[in-house]
Amino acid sequence: MIGIVLVLASLLSVGGQLCQKQATRPLTTGRRRRHLMLWLGLALICMGAAMVLWLLVLQTLPVGIAYPMLSLNFVWVTLAAWKIWHEQVPPRHWLGVALIISGIIILGSAA
């Protein structure tokens, strides 16, 4: 169960980061202020919820086990940027993502 909470905390944290990115996107219309407030508000909600879940994780797992699992954030952000904004991800970056996933698997199996 705590593994699900950890993944959810990670996803909400990433959601907050992605909302911040979306807030910086240029608009061609005059709705810039509304756009900015919407996305920054969503970012705050996501990051606040992530923090609450993270505190639940820390009550259960040692920080030495829990914290490295947040490396998943790098994986989620890379995938989202690639799919949502069609950002270019060089092969070297994909290799890094694969190494992060491998590290998480190794650390997770030791827990």
From Swiss-Prot:
InterPro entries: EamA_dom, Flippase_ArnE, Small_drug/metabolite_transptr. Pathway: Bacterial outer membrane biogenesis; lipopolysaccharide biosynthesis. GO terms for molecular function: carbohydrate derivative transmembrane transporter activity. It is a multi-pass membrane protein. GO terms for biological process: lipid A biosynthetic process; lipopolysaccharide biosynthetic process. It is found in: Cell inner membrane. The chain crosses the membrane at residues 38-58, 61-81, 91-111. Keywords: Cell inner membrane, Cell membrane, Lipid A biosynthesis, Lipid biosynthesis, Lipid metabolism, Lipopolysaccharide biosynthesis, Membrane, Transmembrane, Transmembrane helix, Transport. Residues 40-109 form the EamA domain. Its main location: membrane. One of its GO terms (cellular component) is plasma membrane. It comes from the Bacteria. It holds the Pfam family EamA. Belongs to the ArnE family. Heterodimer of ArnE and ArnF. Translocates 4-amino-4-deoxy-L-arabinose-phosphoundecaprenol (alpha-L-Ara4N-phosphoundecaprenol) from the cytoplasmic to the periplasmic side of the inner membrane. This is Probable 4-amino-4-deoxy-L-arabinose-phosphoundecaprenol flippase subunit ArnE. It comes from Salmonella paratyphi C (strain RKS4594).
